[in-house]
Amino acid sequence: MEFPVARNPQVKWKTGMLNEAEEMKDADFPEIRLFHVEHQLAPDGEKEDCVGKWVVCNPENLKDFSAVGFVFGRKLYKELSTPVGLIQSTWGGTHAESWTSMKVMENNPLYADVLKQYSKEKVSREKDKCKVPATLWNGMIAPIVGSVSYTHLRAHETVLDL
C-alpha cells in the first residue's frame, strides 16, 4: 500500500506527542518505507515517471517522515499486517493550484482568474516557476497514480469546493 504524506522540510521534526523521545527510539519498522519525490517542474504536461529515493522507517530516518505520515503508516502496518509505502511529495511556499491538475482547473470556473494570472510568459523568475498552475501536479503527482493525500493547504476554501 502506498500513501502520500507531506511535511515542511524547513521545520525541525516534532511530533507534538507527549512521548516523542520514546516514539523516535521505538520507530523500527523495516516494512514501512517513505518515498521522497524529488522536485520536478512540468509546465507542459503530465510526466509518466518521477525520481526520488526510498528510506526505511527506523530511528535514524524518522526525521525524513512527517509526524502524520509516521503515525498513519504505523497504524496501517499494525492493523493490516502488510508492508506500507508512504510518499512525500512537497515543495514549500507553493500554491494549491500548482498541485492541481489542469483538467480540474479548466473545468471549474473558480480557477478562471488563476489561469489568466499565471500564463507561462508572466512567470519569468526561476524561483517562481514552481507556482505555475498544474506544474507540480504534472511533475510530482500525476506520475503517482491512485493515491490518497493528506496536506495542510492555505487555499483550503478553493480545494474543498472541488
Regions picked out by a protein language model, each given a short descriptive name:
Residues 151, 155-158:
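Conserved small/polar residues in nucleotide/adenosyl-binding loops
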Residues 1-148:
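Metal/cofactor- and membrane transport-associated sequence elements
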Residues 162:
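Cytosolic catalytic cores of cyclic-nucleotide second-messenger enzymes
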